[in-house]
Amino acid sequence: MKEILIADSGATKTDWCVAKNGEILFRFTGKGISPVYQSEDEITEEIQKNVYPLLKNWPIDAVYFYGSGCIPEKTAVVRNAIYQSLPVETIEVY
């Protein structure tokens, strides 16, 4: 199994964690992400400027994003923003 990225996000902060086989390899905290308060472009900018630079050397295979405001109508906003910065095959937003 390869590395996965898990994000637990509220409106004020996001906890990011790279894991492999149940072991935490790297973790950090960033700004909050909420599609209720931010556009896809704003979320993309946040990920590109503050998340991607910390993850660019990790071979991430999947992203699992758990966030406030990720109602069914808004999950595509977050999924698209993640994909623009971290183009992995599996991106799940809850």
Positions of PLM-derived features:
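Short glycine-rich, Thr/Ser-proximal phosphate-binding strand/loop in the N-terminal lobe
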Residues: 3-45, 58-59
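Short beta-strand-loop/turn "lid" adjacent to the catalytic site in phosphate-handling enzymes
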Residues: 52-93
